[in-house]
């Protein structure tokens, strides 16, 4: 048991109840599940809560298309979601729905408290109305050109291209996404949440350590733009909760969706009387609350949600952790290429433990996107899990069973065991801080050591010699004990494998038993625990995910960066070959006091340090850059500037200002390597 037991409530974002779970979704649930399982492994009281996000016009219209009542459709989707999660070994303590009595009561309670405290404003607004369907158009059912960056085909609440938020009436050339008709303006009374009233509180909270630095920096941009009152109303027809004292008016889905965390926990408390709802959600709560989310919903979880909680007398979350998107083979998930892979399609072909490990091996505490490279996926799983981890037991367990009555020897030389146990606090810290990739690398480095030990000792040779039986017993027992420690470290990531290993050792793997003396312990006969990833199964999964898209008669007009910034004139290879691109590590980054756009970087290029001034100040804080790998032009003539000598150039992509991203090589690249 942990020396000081924590009380923790952890959530993943609620999946929308109008479609299946895909591998992009699964990143978040795997990330959260690993963290929750780790906390439980350490002996903490941890409750992992989730629910389906089951309200809104999209669900109402989808149900109409299917000829079903919305309640019937969301119940069916909820069942499918829960089955997918269960088969991926996602261990929710409770999975509910926002379309529940608990959520209705809590949403009304929070709204009425906000209204009583003066944070709800009422005013008449002009809203877009579909004249063909005779309905007001919610923001996600209007499309047009973004009023900020002018990107086309954007929804009516926020722009996917630049991240700006706005009202549907601000769109340029709006169209109804329901009928395609041009909307007309019509007056209606709406209720607004007074978000600007919480600006000081939010500025303090967002810089309190509750958010990742990247998130806090992004929120600063929104503070600079000025917070706006938030429309929490939708007009009938709408599938959701009716607002108290306002017939025909409904809560916008983003009001009751995060309250769904509370609703699901209340549902769990009703099932388990020993749990106290107020112990976790009251304003003076000493329990911990953590939300894991995707970077696309930062605005709602980091501004609206804590403000709503504060204004209605509830506690705020300790932290909100955001992650990036999933790409497949270096590109956005694609139905035509078969890389838009549903969770169920994956499960039809491959072991969920494979994906859990691969995602863990690539996850960090940052908000970087994660690429699921299917070839690398197969190679890494086969190398790490089959070739290193399970192989350690398969090479030694048989000797224990056949020659030593299935019992482990008392290990005379504990040098390796001590070295493995010495890593537990470092691995624990990596799990706690969501640096799963670092934890996996640490664990696999230990697996390499263990396999090297077995290879050098060669127990298959020792057992053939009468005078080396005790040595063989020692080697195999030592190897299996190291295997037990490794699988205990990996238990949050590979829960099914951990169960198999527990059956093999005939004991539960716990963090507190890592250093247990296994002398005389009897093991069960070894059974195969994990199969290699076969590429034909990966290819079959991709084939099953493909959708044939009808070819268009005319080529699509260019979109995105190429439309405004076309490719330059062709150059000869000789011209390109003159440019010497090198991997560089940013050793130090600091502000340049006299410059609005520049940061001063000290770059290690493998045996040499360069000073470079880079115009990326609007996009990065110095602390975000230190330790990163990037790419620099190493043979650019030094340039004397007012602030000092610039000895090269770092490469970045984007239109400029805050929309710049430095190039970051994949892991394995080292300072000084040439980029070819």
Curated annotation (Swiss-Prot):
<dbReference type="InterPro" id="IPR014729">
    <property type="entry name" value="Rossmann-like_a/b/a_fold"/>
</dbReference>
<dbReference type="Pfam" id="PF01588">
    <property type="entry name" value="tRNA_bind"/>
</dbReference>
<dbReference type="InterPro" id="IPR001412">
    <property type="entry name" value="aa-tRNA-synth_I_CS"/>
</dbReference>
<feature type="short sequence motif" description="'HIGH' region">
    <location>
        <begin position="15"/>
        <end position="25"/>
    </location>
</feature>
<dbReference type="GO" id="GO:0006431">
    <property type="term" value="P:methionyl-tRNA aminoacylation"/>
</dbReference>
<feature type="binding site">
    <location>
        <position position="335"/>
    </location>
    <ligand>
        <name>ATP</name>
    </ligand>
</feature>
<feature type="binding site">
    <location>
        <position position="159"/>
    </location>
    <ligand>
        <name>Zn(2+)</name>
    </ligand>
</feature>
<dbReference type="GO" id="GO:0005524">
    <property type="term" value="F:ATP binding"/>
</dbReference>
<feature type="binding site">
    <location>
        <position position="146"/>
    </location>
    <ligand>
        <name>Zn(2+)</name>
    </ligand>
</feature>
<dbReference type="InterPro" id="IPR023458">
    <property type="entry name" value="Met-tRNA_ligase_1"/>
</dbReference>
<dbReference type="InterPro" id="IPR012340">
    <property type="entry name" value="NA-bd_OB-fold"/>
</dbReference>
<feature type="binding site">
    <location>
        <position position="149"/>
    </location>
    <ligand>
        <name>Zn(2+)</name>
    </ligand>
</feature>
<protein>
    <recommendedName>
        <fullName>Methionine--tRNA ligase</fullName>
        <ecNumber>6.1.1.10</ecNumber>
    </recommendedName>
</protein>
<dbReference type="GO" id="GO:0004825">
    <property type="term" value="F:methionine-tRNA ligase activity"/>
</dbReference>
<keyword id="KW-0820">tRNA-binding</keyword>
<keyword id="KW-0547">Nucleotide-binding</keyword>
<keyword id="KW-0862">Zinc</keyword>
<dbReference type="Pfam" id="PF09334">
    <property type="entry name" value="tRNA-synt_1g"/>
</dbReference>
<keyword id="KW-0436">Ligase</keyword>
<dbReference type="GO" id="GO:0046872">
    <property type="term" value="F:metal ion binding"/>
</dbReference>
<feature type="binding site">
    <location>
        <position position="162"/>
    </location>
    <ligand>
        <name>Zn(2+)</name>
    </ligand>
</feature>
<keyword id="KW-0067">ATP-binding</keyword>
<dbReference type="InterPro" id="IPR009080">
    <property type="entry name" value="tRNAsynth_Ia_anticodon-bd"/>
</dbReference>
<keyword id="KW-0963">Cytoplasm</keyword>
<dbReference type="InterPro" id="IPR014758">
    <property type="entry name" value="Met-tRNA_synth"/>
</dbReference>
<comment type="subunit">
    <text>Homodimer.</text>
</comment>
<dbReference type="Pfam" id="PF19303">
    <property type="entry name" value="Anticodon_3"/>
</dbReference>
<dbReference type="InterPro" id="IPR015413">
    <property type="entry name" value="Methionyl/Leucyl_tRNA_Synth"/>
</dbReference>
<dbReference type="GO" id="GO:0005829">
    <property type="term" value="C:cytosol"/>
</dbReference>
<keyword id="KW-0648">Protein biosynthesis</keyword>
<dbReference type="InterPro" id="IPR033911">
    <property type="entry name" value="MetRS_core"/>
</dbReference>
<keyword id="KW-0030">Aminoacyl-tRNA synthetase</keyword>
<dbReference type="InterPro" id="IPR004495">
    <property type="entry name" value="Met-tRNA-synth_bsu_C"/>
</dbReference>
<dbReference type="InterPro" id="IPR041872">
    <property type="entry name" value="Anticodon_Met"/>
</dbReference>
<dbReference type="GO" id="GO:0000049">
    <property type="term" value="F:tRNA binding"/>
</dbReference>
<dbReference type="InterPro" id="IPR002547">
    <property type="entry name" value="tRNA-bd_dom"/>
</dbReference>
<dbReference type="InterPro" id="IPR029038">
    <property type="entry name" value="MetRS_Zn"/>
</dbReference>
<keyword id="KW-0479">Metal-binding</keyword>
<comment type="function">
    <text>Is required not only for elongation of protein synthesis but also for the initiation of all mRNA translation through initiator tRNA(fMet) aminoacylation.</text>
</comment>
<keyword id="KW-0694">RNA-binding</keyword>
<feature type="short sequence motif" description="'KMSKS' region">
    <location>
        <begin position="332"/>
        <end position="336"/>
    </location>
</feature>
<comment type="similarity">
    <text>Belongs to the class-I aminoacyl-tRNA synthetase family. MetG type 1 subfamily.</text>
</comment>
């Amino acid at each position: 048991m942990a020396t000081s037991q924590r009380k923790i409530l952890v959530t993943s974002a609620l999946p929308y109840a109008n479609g299946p779970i895909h591998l992009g979704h699964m990143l978040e649930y795997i990330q959260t599940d690993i963290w929750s399982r780790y906390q439980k492994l350490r002996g903490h009281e941890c409750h992992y809560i989730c629910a389906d996000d089951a309200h809104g016009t999209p669900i109402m219209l989808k149900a109409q298309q299917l000829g079903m009542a919305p309640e019937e459709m969301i119940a069916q989707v909820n069942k499918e979601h829960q089955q997918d999660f269960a088969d991926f070994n996602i261990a929710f303590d409770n999975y509910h729905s926002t379309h529940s009595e608990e959520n209705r009561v809590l949403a009304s309670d929070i709204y009425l408290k906000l209204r009583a405290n003066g944070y709800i404003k009422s005013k008449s607004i002009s809203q877009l109305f579909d004249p063909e369907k005779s309905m007001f158009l919610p923001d996600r059912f209007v499309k047009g050109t973004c009023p900020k960056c002018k990107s086309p085909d954007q929804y009516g609440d926020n722009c996917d291209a630049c991240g700006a938020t706005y009202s549907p009436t601000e769109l340029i050339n709006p169209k109804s996404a329901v009928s395609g008709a041009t909307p007309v303006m019509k007056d209606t009374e709406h209720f607004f949440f007074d978000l600007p009233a919480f600006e000081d509180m939010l500025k303090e909270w967002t810089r309190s350590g509750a958010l990742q630095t990247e998130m806090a920096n992004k929120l600063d941009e929104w503070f600079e733009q000025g917070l706006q009152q938030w429309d929490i109303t939708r007009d009938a027809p709408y599938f959701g909760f009716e607002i108290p004292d306002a017939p025909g008016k409904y809560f916008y889905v983003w009001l009751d969706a995060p309250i769904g965390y509370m609703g699901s926990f209340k549902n769990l408390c009703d099932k388990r009387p020993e749990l106290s709802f107020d112990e976790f959600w009251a304003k003076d709560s000493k329990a911990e609350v953590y939300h894991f989310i995707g970077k696309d919903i930062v605005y709602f979880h980091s501004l609206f949600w804590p403000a709503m909680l504060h204004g209605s007398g509830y506690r705020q979350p300790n932290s909100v952790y955001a992650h990036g998107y999933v790409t497949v083979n270096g590109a956005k998930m694609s139905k035509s290429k078969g890389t838009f892979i549903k969770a169920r399609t994956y499960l039809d072909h491959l072991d969920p433990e494979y994906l859990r490990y691969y995602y863990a091996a690539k996850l960090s505490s940052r908000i970087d996107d994660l690429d699921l490279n299917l070839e690398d996926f197969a190679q890494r799983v086969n190398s790490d899990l089959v070739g290193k981890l399970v192989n350690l037991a398969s090479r030694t367990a048989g000797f224990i069973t056949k020659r030593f009555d299935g019992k482990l020897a008392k290990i005379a030389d504990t040098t390796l065991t001590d070295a493995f146990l010495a890593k537990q606090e470092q691995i624990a810290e990596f799990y706690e801080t969501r640096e799963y990739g670092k934890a996996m690398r640490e664990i696999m480095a230990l697996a390499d050591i263990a396999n090297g030990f077995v290879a050098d000792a060669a127990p298959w040779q020792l057992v053939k010699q009468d005078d080396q039986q005790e040595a063989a017993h020692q080697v195999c027992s030592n190897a299996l004990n190291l295997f037990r420690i490794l699988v205990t470290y990996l238990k949050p990531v590979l829960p099914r494998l951990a169960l198999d290993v527990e059956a093999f050792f005939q004991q539960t793997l716990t963090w507190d038993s890592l250093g247990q003396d296994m002398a005389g312990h009897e093991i069960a006969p070894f059974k195969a625990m994990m199969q290699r990833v076969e590429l034909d199964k990966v290819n079959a999964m991709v084939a099953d995910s493909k959708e044939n898209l009808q070819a268009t008669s005319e080529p699509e007009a260019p979109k995105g960066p190429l439309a405004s910034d076309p490719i330059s004139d062709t150059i000869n290879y000789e011209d390109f070959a003159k440019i010497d691109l090198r991997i560089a590590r940013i050793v130090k980054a600091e502000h340049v006091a006299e410059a609005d756009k520049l940061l001063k970087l000290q770059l290690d290029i493998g045996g040499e340090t360069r000073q470079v001034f880079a115009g990326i100040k609007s996009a990065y804080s110095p602390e975000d850059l230190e330790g990163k790998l990037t790419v620099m032009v190493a043979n650019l003539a030094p340039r004397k500037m007012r602030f000092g000598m610039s000895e090269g150039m770092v490469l970045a992509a984007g239109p400029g200002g805050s929309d710049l991203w430095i190039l970051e090589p994949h892991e394995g690249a080292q300072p000084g390597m040439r980029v070819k």
